[in-house]
Amino acid sequence: QASEVLAVSIGPDDAQQQLRNALAMGADRAILVKCEQPVEPLVVARAFIKLIERESPLLVILGKQAIDDDSGQTGQMLAALWDRPQATSASKLELQDGVARVTREVDAGLETIEVDLPAVCTVDLRLNEPRYIKLPDIMKAKKKPLDVTELAALGVDSAPLLQVLKFEPPPQRQKG
């Protein structure tokens, strides 16, 4: 249903490989926002807002949580900054007549909600199974546009606002 699929990643140069994979899976173009150091969810959301202002998407889809820090905050922060509705942890997503119908798993079963577009949707791994990438698609992906910009070029400050005080293992369990 989408007129265009744009894949975006924020990270170091080697994140281009994940974007090339997204292009090989069917994305039309990609943008890498280059940033060598780890960034907090709010920084990512602020960078996405700058891209949203430029691209005007109807739907922004993100994973429900980041793999590097397991935070799960970027989607909610993005929706708040964009002042648009959000649906989280989607395991099924349908678009029709300017509305996104989202089904997600909750403790009591399945919950279905509708949000008006434009919107932000965070998705669960059950949403779909990634496409197998074929060699011809890999070759075509090399010719698709992959723009690279710097986080600073978007006018986003990447200075951390959070400070990790310590990491420690959980207490050992008692035997018996």
What kind of feature is each model-predicted range?
Residues Q1-G176:
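N-terminal glycine-rich FAD/FM-binding segment characteristic of electron-transfer flavoproteins
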